[in-house]
Amino acid sequence: MSELEQLRQEAEQLRNQIRDARKACGDSTLTQITAGLDPVGRIQMRTRRTLRGHLAKIYAMHWGTDSRLLVSASQDGKLIIWDSYTTNKVHAIPLRSSWVMTCAYAPSGNFVACGGLDNICSIYSLKTREGNVRVSRELPGHTGYLSCCRFLDDNQIITSSGDTTCALWDIETGQQTVGFAGHSGDVMSLSLAPDGRTFVSGACDASIKLWDVRDSMCRQTFIGHESDINAVAFFPNGYAFTTGSDDATCRLFDLRADQELLMYSHDNIICGITSVAFSRSGRLLLAGYDDFNCNIWDAMKGDRAGVLAGHDNRVSCLGVTDDGMAVATGSWDSFLKIWN
């Protein structure tokens, strides 16, 4: 047996030991704890608005903190800021690269960001004196595509990339201030903790890592998925997060228990998950799928509580407003839909 093969086996044994040690610490299961909870019942949501204007596949969307405006990014080379109440376009921003994969709205509402196969995170200022939108900063540095970006504030943004790393940037100087390396596959998604001090990243190595924003340290690594992880989202209290994967499952992981608590899957669901989000209370988990649907899960019990059907192609992105009053789904059919 080669030395490398021996090391592989040892690593596998250690992994199993760690898994067993984690299991031994678990004094109870989520299923046992939530047995007394009333089921949420059947959740039915209606399409309240359809946002028409993109001319090609929509790849990403993100709500503003006002729960009214949202930004979407499409393969048509446009970033559109929408008013979800009126369905009007507030801004339509032509991009230098049409190969956009992610977009983000700053908490202040002053900036939006996007990026994709150009490997660059572009920041756009929405509140210029002239009233027009312009590029305020471009952040080059990743050696792979930009898969996700999220603002910490008007001067800091975190990006994830196909180069297997994440990065924290100082927007003012255009410099990377912290690099986060540790994944062995493309990083597909990131989610900021509610307090903004940590974030989780999901990658094509089928693992999720928890990072400290300030010091580039990987605090925890979570395994269990059997394929690429496309989406991650923090639970509203910041102590847990959910993931969506090409293995056709969503999973709930707890930071304090240091392990997986629950898996959301169904025999009829055999396609990958593109996007995940929690309701404001955390009781419902919404997940977008390759089969054109968005499933609603009872996050505590693991049962399917409803389905949002209305798109004619893959649901590529979704988001719940900060006030919890609406859900937006974006699809390869070029439309965004607002539900509640």
From Swiss-Prot:
The modification Phosphotyrosine is found at Y239. It is found in: Cytoplasm, Perinuclear region; Cell membrane. Keywords: Acetylation, Cell membrane, Cytoplasm, Disease variant, Intellectual disability, Membrane, Phosphoprotein, Repeat, Transducer, WD repeat. It comes from the Eukaryota. One of its GO terms (biological process) is regulation of potassium ion transmembrane transport. The modification N-acetylserine is found at S2. One of its GO terms (cellular component) is plasma membrane. Transmembrane segments: none annotated. Expressed in all cardiac subcompartments and in the brain, with highest levels in the atrioventricular node and brain. SUPFAM superfamilies: WD40 repeat-like. One of its GO terms (molecular function) is GTPase binding. Pfam families: WD40_Gbeta. Its main location: cytoplasm. WD repeats lie at residues 53-83, 95-125, 141-170, 182-212, 224-254, 268-298, 310-340. G proteins are composed of 3 units, alpha, beta and gamma. In this context, interacts with GNAI2 and GNG2. Interacts with ARHGEF18 and RASD2. Interacts with ATXN10. Interacts with SCN8A. Guanine nucleotide-binding proteins (G proteins) are involved as a modulator or transducer in various transmembrane signaling systems. The beta and gamma chains are required for the GTPase activity, for replacement of GDP by GTP, and for G protein-effector interaction. It is linked to Neurodevelopmental disorder with hypotonia and dysmorphic facies: An autosomal dominant disorder characterized by global developmental delay, hypotonia, and variably impaired intellectual development, often with speech delay and delayed walking. Most patients have dysmorphic facial features. Clinical features are highly variable and may include congenital cardiac defects, non-specific renal anomalies, joint contractures or joint hyperextensibility, dry skin, and cryptorchidism. Belongs to the WD repeat G protein beta family. This is Guanine nucleotide-binding protein G(I)/G(S)/G(T) subunit beta-2. The gene is GNB2.
